[in-house]
Amino acid sequence: MVQKEMINKKISQDNSFIQNNNLADFDFLDAKKNSEIKTVSTGSLHLDEALGTGGLPLGRIVELYGNESSGKTTVALHAVASFQKAGKVACYIDAEGALDLSYAKAIGIDLGKLLVAHPKHGENAFALMESLIKTNKVALIVVDSVAALIPKQELEGNMDDQTIGLHARMMSKGLRRVQSLLPESDTCLLFINQLREKPGVMFGNGEVTTGGRALKFYASMRMEAKRSELLKDRFGNYVGIKSKLTVSKNKVARPFGVAFLEIMFNRGIVYEHEVIELALKHNVVVRSDNAYSFKSQNIAIGKEKLFSVLAEKPELFEQIKQLTIKQIHSPPPPAS
């Protein structure tokens, strides 16, 4: 404390700018406080593990991007449901006007507690984000999507007006403003973005996200979603997809984590399968030949029987789930 006062006194004596402008004293960081990152589950255990934090970080910007039908909106809706289950408020900024309320309800979202906004233009959307962040009452803001945030000038102009770079400039200015508010808040800002083809690219990656480079810079996390497989039922009908999510940027944990999500068209991510897969991976449930045991007690013979038993015994499933989540959140063992 004495050292801090001495430093502040010396700076005040040597720098008239600080004296004339009544700037606040410098302070030392609280190492414990600044090392703790508050997170809330994404609603997918596979994705929580891939992120390395156990969920989405509060006070940060996150970008979820990918091609069409890759599961982006489903992942965002599961995050909304997870935040609600944690007792937090979520807002969905539906710039595309394509939010399917029946699908959102099937995923587990309480529609009566969901804030939904339909901004007229991009500047309106950013003004809304600022207002919500300042309240510090909204823990998750989903923006669907960056491509649909049309600048006001473009909206009010004519179709033949030149608007090159207008969208990128709006994104850059808007992100600067909201980013200045986030560090003092408990709000996660999740942007859904799309990929576009770069003209004239013959080699390398020919795809780029919309909205310029600002979102790439300000995002603490970036996740790319790719559809890796179409899922069929026993009659050959398409019932879902398998989506690969890659953490392409991560400023709060290790980057390049990968998660494969099983998404059904009528219900979203198959959470029960994720719990079992990760329980087996972390030895919460142990497999020996075709037998499955939990805490040294045999619970099922065969995987189909295992799913059946856990569906009939929700208290057993809950025990396995909680132990699995604990394993995911545990720090890695020290290197030998």
UniProtKB/Swiss-Prot annotation:
Keywords: ATP-binding, Cytoplasm, DNA damage, DNA recombination, DNA repair, DNA-binding, Nucleotide-binding, SOS response. PROSITE patterns: RECA_1 (PS00321), RECA_2 (PS50162), RECA_3 (PS50163). This is Protein RecA. CDD domains: RecA. PANTHER family: MITOCHONDRIAL DNA REPAIR PROTEIN RECA HOMOLOG-RELATED (PTHR45900:SF1), RECA (PTHR45900). It comes from Mycoplasma pneumoniae (strain ATCC 29342 / M129 / Subtype 1) (Mycoplasmoides pneumoniae). The keyword Nucleotide-binding applies. GO terms for biological process: DNA recombination; DNA repair; SOS response. One of its GO terms (cellular component) is cytosol. It is found in: Cytoplasm. HAMAP family: RecA (MF_00268). The keyword Secreted does not apply. Belongs to the RecA family. One of its GO terms (molecular function) is ATP binding.
